Amino acid sequence: MAALLGRRFGMAAAALIALAALGSAASGTASKSSFVKSTVKAHDVVIFSKSYCPYCRRAKAVFKELELKKEPYVVELDQREDGWEIQDALSDMVGRRTVPQVFVHGKHLGGSDDTVEAYESGKLAKLLNIDVKEDL
C-alpha cells in the first residue's frame, strides 16, 4: 500500500513540476513578447538578427546605404541567452521564425527580401520619411 501511495504521489509531483515548467515557459514567452513590443515601440527601426546570418547582414546593409541619422536598433539573438525565447515570441507575433525580422515605426516590414524590395521600390524611404538619392 505504501508503495502504491508513493507512486501516486510521485506521479502527482511529477505532473505538478511539468505544469510549473509549462507555466514558466509560457510566462517567459509572454515576457519576451513584451520585450519585443517595447523594443519595437522605443526605436524607429529595429532589426532582430543573428550576427552570422548573411540575410541579416544584407538587411542591415540596406539601412547603412540609406545613411540614416539614427542607426537601427539591432537585437543579435545569437548573442543573448534568451535569444531563442525572443525568436519564439517573434514567431508568435509575425508568423515567421526566420531572421532578420525588421520593424519600421512600430510596423513589421518583414525579412531580408522584404527589406530589399521596400528599399528598391522606394517604399522604405517613404516609411522613414527620407529623400531618396537618385543615381546620376
From Swiss-Prot:
GO cellular component terms, semicolon-separated: cytoplasm
Domain Glutaredoxin: residue ranges: 33-135
Subcellular location: Cytoplasm
GO biological process terms on file: cellular response to oxidative stress
Gene3D superfamilies: Glutaredoxin
Sections of the chain in a coiled coil: none
Keyword tags: Cytoplasm, Disulfide bond, Electron transport, Redox-active center, Transport
GO MF term set: glutathione disulfide oxidoreductase activity
Disulfide bonds: 53-56
Function: Has a glutathione-disulfide oxidoreductase activity in the presence of NADPH and glutathione reductase. Reduces low molecular weight disulfides and proteins.
Family of the protein in this entry: Belongs to the glutaredoxin family. CPYC subfamily.
Listed name of the protein: Glutaredoxin-C8
Organism: Oryza sativa subsp. japonica
Annotated gene: GRXC8
